[in-house]
Amino acid sequence: MSVPVVTVTDLYHPPEDPGDNVDLIMGYGLDEVDLRAVILDALDEKRHLVDGGVPGYPGPRDPGIVPVTQLNAVYGHNVPFATSPFTRMRTPYDTMTEVPAFQQAGIDLLLDTLQRSDEKVHVLSFGSARPIAVAYNREPELVAAKVARVHLCGGTSTPTYLEWNVLQDPQAMIRLVSTDLPIALYPCATEESCYAHDRHNTFYRLHDMRWIEGMHPALRRYLGYALGRLTRPDYLRVLDEDLPDEVMEPVYARSHDVWETAVWVSVTGRRIVRRPDGTHRIVRGDDVGPGDVEIRNEQLPCRAWPHESGLYSFEPTDEPTPTSVFVRDDPAEYERAMNEATPALFQSFRPPEPWHGDVRTDDREMTR
């Protein structure tokens, strides 16, 4: 049975963090996911930012309409998408009704998707969480009734380091963590940085991206277009053609920082396992074999409370609680496992053949 999902992502075009372009493939490629909508979470200052962000990916940039359209085309889907407010919330209770209509569309889409769903929906936040907080401020009863869980990817395992997603909108984080909504917390950073490891943050690093070469051709080209920062306007036709080595080789050589995989593993009920032969895979729960050893990727019940900075604190509890926090046992072991399991998962994704941008042979003949 598929899991209804709305993903809220600070995905940009050209990329600000190429991890968002990579991560969105999960929503399309995982069979267990019924992707109902994509809400584009943009911030005006990031749109105009030239320096800063991930090295090698300067701005300016705009909301990721292009990559969502590309994946819709590759998979033959029509997942709706819309942008949300470009400015921060002024207070935790801000409804942001005064922003331009174009920027209202993402909040309207989120609320409409919840309203139309006969099942509770998992809402995944890979950004500021502003669209979710504003939607809750506008329609708290609807959100409470229709959200299965908010999966909040952001924050710090100790409230000392101002993590990037929190910085994008502290008021949004304060609002969500203060509610009684069921929330799964996935801290991105430790007290040191967002590139350090501990048991409660989700970060790991892929040593290179050579594995993209083994992906489905359309998905390989999609990532080449994004991670290679191509400016071609024919962003659908580019998916029909292999990109030159001078574009792809620098992409393959990059390391890649990841925070999002733990969320998708949790939402789908998948497991990270070490097989008896020593290989690592991300598998369905019912595909765990008797000789497999599970690599912990779990949610631990906790109490959580926000701070004025937008960061939060948490403590494990045995009491009933709507809140939980990510936990793993050995971050180094986790990273070793994911350096094998994550590439294998992406290489397993197979969009419909031929991909839906292909022109039929008889049509090609007619154009000659």
Question: Which residues does each PLM region occupy?
Answer:
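Sec-exported extracytoplasmic/periplasmic mature domains
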Residues: A73, S178-L181, G224-L227
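Metal-dependent C-N hydrolase catalytic cores
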Residues: S2, K46-S117, T317-P322, V327-R368
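Conformational coupling and interaction surfaces
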Residues: S2-T7, V22-A37, L167, Y186-R368
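Intrinsically disordered, low-complexity boundary segments flanking structured domains
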Residues: I25-M26, V66-L71, E139, P250-V251
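Active-site histidine-anchored catalytic micro-motif
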Residues: S2-D51, P55-D62, T91-N201, R205-L206, ...
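Residues in well-ordered beta-strands of folded domains
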Residues: A82, H151, V265
